[in-house]
UniProtKB/Swiss-Prot annotation:
Modified residues (Leucine amide): L8
Name the record gives this protein: HUG-Pyrokinin
One GO CC term on file: extracellular region
Disulfide pairings: none
GO-annotated biological processes: neuropeptide signaling pathway
Function text: Mediates visceral muscle contractile activity (myotropic activity).
Coiled-coil residues: none
Location within or outside the cell: Secreted
Tissue: In larvae, expressed in the brain and ring gland but not in the midgut or the thoracic perisympathetic organs (tPSO) and abdominal perisympathetic organs (aPSO) (at protein level). In adults, expressed in the brain, corpora cardiaca, corpora allata and thoracic-abdominal ganglion (at protein level).
Record field: transmembrane: none
Organism field: Delia radicum
Family: Belongs to the pyrokinin family.
Keywords: Amidation, Neuropeptide, Secreted
């Protein structure tokens, strides 16, 4: 699972 998803 991805905890942090940066919005580019």
């Amino acid at each position: 699972s991805v905890q942090f998803k940066p919005r580019l």
